[in-house]
């Protein structure tokens, strides 16, 4: 059994921490809010993000990152992309990482798992993959220990012990295999991959497609023109756009897009009632949620006002930058960008991408 640190007290981080604790690992969860830690330790519940789900009594939480990371064999970053740089900076200030900065590249570095989805922009606003951005933030000795974890895995179901499949992707095959074995259990199947680029692109862009799915879902309630066939059209077209972006950014394995990381994660994100991005698409139609914003830049800067985190909004802005730079044909992503930027309505969007 291993010692594992989960950095992030949201739903997904808490769910994975619970699963790993049930597996017999010693797990420490870091959360910024002391109230979250106190509730987990005293009541075995993450009241804010996983209400009603009883967590293992052996799972401990702390707001002290140095304490949580001190002896971990695996450190998992489970924070939204907008907080990744800040959390990585905090991790760098811990005594353990301060010591490791002076050490040679080797086995002293813990494995570093990454659950964060999306892209990280540079100072010019050009987006980069999570592992590339994180590699620039962490000591060079940690680069070979980075493992990206993704797949169709709603936090609520993982916390409830429902059977789930994940992909552990890394440029270092041994690191991917080690994380695979740590995460694997009777209820969680994990497969290793070397296509760390493709897996990350799938994880980021599927949230954009899910917003479009929410639009379609809401519009279907008032139109006889849309049905299951239409959803399959959108799903297939969305997967094609994900593959287009993945190939451009350097994906090495075409099968990634038909794996758990690709079609698997896309399907559950688009169809499940748990999905915040699908919910956002529905809210565009039913609640006019975009009416309070002047465009996508305004929306991104005030996204917390929505009341829940729809990561596909920010991802859509980044995909547009990539598409413009590399002249990529991604009509769903481009059309959705136009909607979020208040340039186009949902009806026009559906007519253009579905020929309706």
Curated annotation (Swiss-Prot):
Any one Gene Ontology BP term: phospholipid biosynthetic process
Active site: 206
Residues at which sn-glycerol 3-phosphate binds: 117, 151, 153, 206, 265, 276-277
Binding site for NADPH: 12, 32-33, 117, 155, 276, 309, 311
First-tier enzyme category under EC: oxidoreductase
Keywords: Cytoplasm, Lipid biosynthesis, Lipid metabolism, NAD, NADP, Nucleotide-binding, Oxidoreductase, Phospholipid biosynthesis, Phospholipid metabolism
Catalytic activity field: sn-glycerol 3-phosphate + NAD(+) = dihydroxyacetone phosphate + NADH + H(+); sn-glycerol 3-phosphate + NADP(+) = dihydroxyacetone phosphate + NADPH + H(+)
Pathway listed: Membrane lipid metabolism; glycerophospholipid metabolism
EC number: 1.1.1.94
Gene name, Swiss-Prot/TrEMBL: gpsA
Localization in the cell: Cytoplasm
Gene Ontology CC annotations of this record: cytosol
Protein name, entry field: Glycerol-3-phosphate dehydrogenase [NAD(P)+]
GO molecular function: glycerol-3-phosphate dehydrogenase [NAD(P)+] activity; NAD binding
Gene3D superfamilies membership: N-(1-d-carboxylethyl)-l-norvaline Dehydrogenase, domain 2 (1.10.1040.10), NAD(P)-binding Rossmann-like Domain (3.40.50.720)
Function, in words: Catalyzes the reduction of the glycolytic intermediate dihydroxyacetone phosphate (DHAP) to sn-glycerol 3-phosphate (G3P), the key precursor for phospholipid synthesis.
Predominant subcellular localization, coarse grouping: cytoplasm
HAMAP family: NAD_Glyc3P_dehydrog (MF_00394)
Family: Belongs to the NAD-dependent glycerol-3-phosphate dehydrogenase family.
Domain of life from the UniProt record: Bacteria
């Amino acid at each position: 059994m291993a010692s594992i640190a989960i950095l992030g007290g949201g739903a997904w981080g808490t769910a994975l921490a619970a699963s790993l604790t049930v597996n017999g690992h010693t797990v420490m969860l870091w959360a910024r809010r002391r109230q979250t830690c106190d509730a987990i330790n005293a009541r075995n519940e993450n009241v804010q993000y996983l209400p009603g789900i009883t967590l293992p009594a052996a799972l401990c939480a702390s707001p002290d990152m140095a304490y949580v990371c001190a002896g971990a064999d695996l450190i998992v970053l489970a924070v939204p992309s907008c907080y990744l740089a800040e959390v990585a900076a905090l991790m760098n200030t811990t005594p353990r990482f301060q010591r490791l900065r002076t050490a040679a590249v080797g086995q002293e570095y813990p494995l570093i798992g990454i659950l964060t989805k999306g892209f990280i922009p540079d100072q010019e606003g050009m987006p980069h993959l999570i592992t590339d951005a994180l590699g620039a933030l962490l000591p060079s000795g940690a680069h070979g220990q980075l493992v990206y974890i993704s797949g169709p895995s709603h936090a609520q179901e993982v916390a409830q012990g429902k059977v789930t499949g994940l992909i552990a992707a890394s440029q270092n095959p041994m690191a991917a295999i080690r994380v695979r074995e740590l995460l694997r259990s009777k209820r969680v199947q994990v497969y290793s991959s070397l296509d760390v680029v493709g897996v990350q692109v799938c994880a980021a862009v599927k949230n954009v497609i899910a917003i479009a799915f929410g639009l379609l879902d809401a519009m279907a309630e008032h139109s006889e023109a849309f049905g299951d066939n239409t959803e399959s059209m959108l799903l297939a077209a969305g997967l094609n756009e994900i593959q287009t972006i993945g190939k451009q950014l350097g994906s090495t394995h075409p099968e990634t897009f038909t794996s758990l990381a690709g079609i698997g994660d896309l399907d559950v994100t688009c169809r499940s009632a748990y999905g915040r991005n699908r919910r956002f698409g529905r809210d565009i139609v039913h609640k006019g949620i975009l009416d309070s914003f002047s465009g996508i830049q305004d929306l991104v800067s005030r996204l917390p006002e929505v009341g829940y985190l729809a990561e596909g909004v920010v991802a859509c802005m980044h995909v547009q930058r990539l598409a413009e730079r590399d002249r990529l044909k991604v009509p769903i992503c481009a059309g959705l960008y136009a909607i979020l930027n208040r340039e186009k309505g949902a009806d026009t969007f559906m007519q253009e991408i579905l020929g309706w």
